[in-house]
């Protein structure tokens, strides 16, 4: 069984969320469970051309949450959250 990861969220990611409401609650709940489901990956991946690091992107309540797994230290780093526009 995969080991759970500790989740770290860049504070700037929280600033784009609504101050209250269901959408905010859904994203915060995703942060809470991400450590135990990170091994499943996101909805899609992006590769940073400079670092060659793979980032996972998950759609949650109208937001794109970008994160990566730092395997050696069992941590997940949430590095970006932005609203999805059509």
Q: At which residue positions do the language-model features occur?
A:
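Basic/aromatic recognition patch in beta-strand/loop cores that engages polyanionic ligands
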Residues: 43-86
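N-terminal hydrophobic or amphipathic segments with adjacent small-residue motifs
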Residues: 35-36, 56
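Arg/Lys-rich, positively charged N-terminal/basic patches that mediate binding to nucleic acids
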Residues: 1-32
């Amino acid at each position: 069984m995969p080991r759970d990861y500790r989740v770290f969220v860049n504070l700037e990611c929280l600033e784009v969320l609504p101050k209250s409401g269901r959408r905010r609650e859904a994203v915060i709940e995703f942060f809470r469970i991400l450590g135990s489901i990170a091994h499943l990956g996101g909805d899609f991946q992006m590769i940073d051309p400079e670092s060659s690091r793979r980032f996972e992107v998950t759609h949650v309540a109208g937001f794109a949450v970008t994160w990566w797994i730092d395997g050696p230290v069992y941590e997940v780093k949430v590095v970006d959250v932005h609203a999805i526009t059509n």
